[in-house]
Structures are given as structure tokens and as C-alpha cells.
Amino acid sequence: HYFVGSWGEGLYEIQGRLILNRYTPDNAPFVRAWDNDSPTAHNVRVGSLCYDHRGNLWMAQGQGLVANPLVVRTPDGTMKAISYPDIELVNAFGPMLALPNGVKWLLIYHRSADGNNGVFIFDDKGTPLDQSDDEYRLVSKFVDRTGKEIAAKRYYDLALDPSGSLWIATDKGPICVANPSSFIS
């Protein structure tokens, strides 16, 4: 049993070789990338999927400046669209990674308003359907051990190594975050 995001057709729920559901704005909190209510419009863009340690499926909707760009699906099937002020103007997201403690790191490929790409970090504190206790942070600049700014303009990928360090692939080379769980505070 698994889910597949698509760049136009929404979210698919699959078991074996059988498609159980296709989620679109008609049956889930997704929105179309542009204003077109036609059911044949191929503009429901769901990407950046990851599971957290509680079994919640997190997804980012891209393209078209979606007001509620994050969607979570809890293990019981409840889905909710979520927004944070720092990502309301994001036009395209990259990969998302959930740390073992539940903190999520989401790459920003294109921010329309100011052009600042970077990493959005958020922690739902174990209450994915309630944002009142959430912590979040947008990071567009990193600093190395000597205090020198790493002037990355593009962020490509994320990986967690066996020691718990987070690696971010950028146009300026790799960035290593030694303690990513505490980076949000």
C-alpha cells in the first residue's frame, strides 16, 4: 500500500497493482495550479511526499502560488491543507524529509515574491491537524563553522546519514547540518 504524487493528476493511492483512489480537489484539500475547474485539466500538482515517524503522509503542492501548499494525510485517512506565512508564495518545492523526531525539512526551489530559495523547517509537535503549537523557520542562508556565509542559490536534495547529520546538496556544494533536530529553535 503506497501513495504516488503526480505533477498534474493529483495523488494516487495504490495497493499492489490496483489504484484504490485518485485524490484531486474534488475529494481532497488539493487545489489546481491555475484557475480551471475542468475535471480534465491536468493541473493538480502534488510532490515532495514523505512520511513522518507517526505514519502521517506529508505533501507539498507546487506551481501557482497555492495558499495552503502543504497537505497532511493522517493514518486514519483524514486530510488537511496547511499553510505557514513563509511558504505561501512558493512556486515550486523540492524534496521533503522527516527526521526521526518528526521535524520536517522541505526544500524551496522557487519563491516568486522575493526569489529567496532555501529550506523550510517545521515541527507539528505531534499534532498534524492542529497548527497552534507548531514551530517553523525559513532558512535562506547557512553559515559554516568559521562564520562565513554559504551563498547558495539553489538547493537540490536532502539526505540523513547514519550518524544523524543532515546533508543538503546545493549549487555551492554540500552543506552538513550536524544536529538538524535542534536547528528549528
PLM regions and their residue ranges:
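Carboxylate-rich, polar loop motifs that coordinate divalent cations or form catalytic acidic clusters
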Residues: 1-185
